[in-house]
A protein has these predicted regions:
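PLP-dependent aminotransferase-class I/II
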Residues: 1-3
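Glycine-rich phosphate/pyrophosphate-binding loop at beta-loop-alpha junctions
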Residues: 5-7, 15-113
Length: 113
């Protein structure tokens, strides 16, 4: 019921502490990267990390344990869909407009509805 519940989106958006909670929960991604690299390569860090930045949870989890590691180059990519001028794009950083989602002011892809 809206008067006693709150929907928490699974993205790194909204007021604190929700983005931090999502990032910490998704940090299992970078834990697994460290574990597999150590097993297969004998080191726990990659040269590069590449992640998509849609809602942010995948990227946050991927870089979580490497964010302060200067040995790792981090590359974040935004989905372009069929191009920014196609009308079929999810390029929020490029095409988004300020809006409110879950009490947080951020860039959004939205229409009048």
């Amino acid at each position: 019921h809206p008067s006693d519940t709150y929907y928490i989106i699974g993205s790194t958006v909204g007021p604190h502490p929700y983005p931090d909670m999502v990032a910490r929960l998704q940090s299992v991604i970078s834990e697994e990267i460290k574990k597999q690299l150590l097993e297969k390569e004998g080191r726990d860090h990659p040269d590069y990390l590449i992640a998509c930045v849609g809602g942010g949870s995948n990227a946050a989890g991927t870089i979580y344990h490497y964010i302060d590691d200067e040995r790792v180059k981090i590359v974040l990519a935004e989905a372009g869909g069929k191009g920014i001028d196609s009308g079929m794009s999810a390029a929020t950083i490029h095409l988004g407009h300020l809006g409110i989602i879950h009490g947080s002011k951020t860039l959004l892809m939205q229409n009048e509805d």
